[in-house]
Amino acid sequence: MVPINTTTGTPQHTRVAGALGAKDSSVRLQAALAVGSNPDPGLLETLVERCAVEPDFFVRDMLSWALARLSPEITLPRIRQELDSEHAQARGQALHTLSKIGDRRAWDWITRDLLRDTDDEVARTAWRVAVALVPEDEKKNLVDDLVAQLGRGGRDVRLSLSRALVDLGSVIEPALEKAAANLDPTVAAHARATELLLRYPEAGFDVAIDEAKRVVTLGPERAAAAATAAVAARVAGSPETAATMESTGSTGSTEAAEIADC
């Protein structure tokens, strides 16, 4: 555990720091709640330091909430420093805290290095924050950075990336169309699944990726038509049409599933 510096704080600050570092996670959670309920700028450093080492998800989330309750004028500069930390949790939690604060001044801090962070959890958080803060005239550049990572990671990572892209809206369509023709079948399937989610968000990621994998070996034109028709049929609740589309794509389904497995 990273030690917390309490030498310059008041006795109350020392007690709070002790509670935030207690062995019992419920004690730490209550302490973070108390700090957030009574914002104290003197505890800024303690909260930031705890974010970097706190093992419990719910406590970390409460710590970020407590930081968001402080004035952004003092909080943002300190959080910005954490984005360059060598510790992945510190970077990720700093990004999460920025999402809670929601101050668009932080957009410039969401660098390409963060969007492509080697730690999946950091990258996923960076995608979410970037989509929330991006100015309108920067959306295309953000789309390019996100689309470049299609096919990355397992199901949860790919779902996060698809959600981030879909949240940007129709601006993603040209880049996805290009990525859907990628020679890497994993990238192509992920791009097609994201296209389908944009058109039919109610279909869900698993349905979209299943259809994308099913038709990825049929060729660009037939694949796009088959995937769109199959998902549309499922959304419309037409089992006959869906069955027809499943039959159409059956010849390539096994190979597609192997090469585009999520």
Where are these regions (language model features)?
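Amphipathic alpha-helical scaffolding segments comprising HEAT/armadillo-like alpha-solenoid repeats
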Residues: 2-19, 38-52, 72-84, 103-116, ...
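Short inter-helical turns and helix N-cap capping residues of alpha-solenoid HEAT/ARM repeat scaffolds
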Residues: 23-24, 55-56, 86-88, 118-119, ...
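Non-membrane alpha-helical segments in proteins
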Residues: 26-34, 49, 57-69, 93-96
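Conserved hydrophobic register position within alpha-solenoid helical repeats
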Residues: 31, 63, 94, 126, ...
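Alpha-solenoid repeat junctions
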Residues: 35, 39, 67, 71, ...
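Eukaryotic acidic, Ser/Thr-rich intrinsically disordered low-complexity regions
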Residues: 177-235, 258-262
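Intrinsically disordered, low-complexity tandem-repeat regions
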Residues: 237-258
